[in-house]
């Protein structure tokens, strides 16, 4: 096989053409071309020979194996048990905003564990159904979920705001930018809570410790770390799957004599509101994932010195951002977001001729064309790095060698240029990661990096079940114990043996890059189920074994069609490289398919659920 360099030479003309198109699109504020814009059914005669793609795939595998050689597959190289000497990394810097209160021993109709978009969306739908008794139990000091916790400099959403921010039709709000910043999103979350009167019964600074089904009263007993013992007819797990900060297991974390924190617990008291206190500080940040990509440009501008410790680079694409045109906003008619969402679900119209070509392809050819288009997109990202980053060695280190979507793709216009600054140093650990921290700071490959501030951009624990407390259902069975032999749900929302319990954002549900689309659909479904129970004098509903098994098999039938996740470099999308059961993942049909299943299940409630009446 030819070397990558030789193959890339033959690829140069094609890459230049793509790059020029991308720049033109960016100038016109149009969405840049990416892998999802490629039609893999086209002949692709202007693409490189197949041997080029095969060699790139070999390189991807080499990079994956290199990283797995440094650590075991799975999450053992991280810890989310932030207690003892690590407790400070989980402390809420805004906890002073929580008022003291007496323990609660009351009852509500609907109780949410978590106060992010899952709870806000579903509560809005429940209000529309006339449900008045709604309580949000949130460990933070306010609603907002991830946008409450993540307030690091530069934080913003990487999904178009007109799609990501939910309930725009209902609130009449129009985002200020194409991509909304974190502060705007957080304020919008509070606006939703006010609009739907969700603060009245909410409790903050409170962590649920157990949720137990009382078979005699057929209600859930919810206990918290504040001494509460509340009862609820319906409980909705809305705590999110990326809400618990984690740290890499690095020897000596506790030895560091300087200041340190996790990105999701940003200490503005130390850095200053505008990072002005960092002007004379040497700063290190460990991690180059989505949070780091947004924070690093701001740190680069403010810090005296910045060391960026990288294990695996993120893919960085163009961020086509702009302020919302007020004239365009004034033309929006009621229902505009719902129509926009429906168009996205329906997808583009595919000509019959293209459908016919796709239908005639073998599975192997389809996979190959998809992979080749994916590699085309990644090589364009590589070319952009070469164009932006001045130092050739740094540019090579910043190139991601994996398929797009192996890791969360990032979009930023200032991240790559940050490495052209004289005060910024990239410390590429080449897949190994930082292994030691001393009193002075990180130490890698025999080099001691003396710093004043150490920031951990090491991400969050991925909770497969969508729950964090002990949920005890019928017959005293802990939900986590039930899942030991594989996750079992209906739609990723219901689990047999746990009546009136709903799980949001967990596995076996559909996954979309715009997560709020999924949460909105789940919220509508949950509100419909609760409304059905209330209107039909049903006290509790629980999915049947048959319905649950049918959904598990549906999930399995859509998994394992490719080896993409297995072939990826370790990351939270593939359980850090660990082998996982075929049912322990997302539903890989389409969003439209998922909604169709939801609708069908609601149309046949008596076939899919067991009811009790009191």
Put a short name on every predicted segment:
Residues 20-22, 26-109, 187, 246-267:
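Extreme N-terminal leader/targeting segments of oxidoreductases
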Residues 28-49, 53, 58, 64, ...:
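C-terminal, flexible cofactor-proximal segment of oxidoreductases
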Residues 76, 80-99, 165-175, 181-185, ...:
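Glycine-rich dinucleotide-binding loop and its adjacent helix/turn
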Residues 100-107, 111-112, 117-143, 150, ...:
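Rossmann-like dinucleotide-binding core of oxidoreductases
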Residues 176-242:
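Feature captures the FAD/FMN-dependent oxidoreductase FAD-binding
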Residues 204-218, 426-441:
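A conserved short coil-to-beta-strand element within the FAD-binding core of flavoproteins
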Residues 225-234, 279, 445-453:
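Core beta-strand elements of the Rossmann-like FAD/NAD(P) dinucleotide-binding domain
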Residues 356-435, 444, 449-465, 552-614:
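C-terminal catalytic lobe of FAD-dependent flavoproteins
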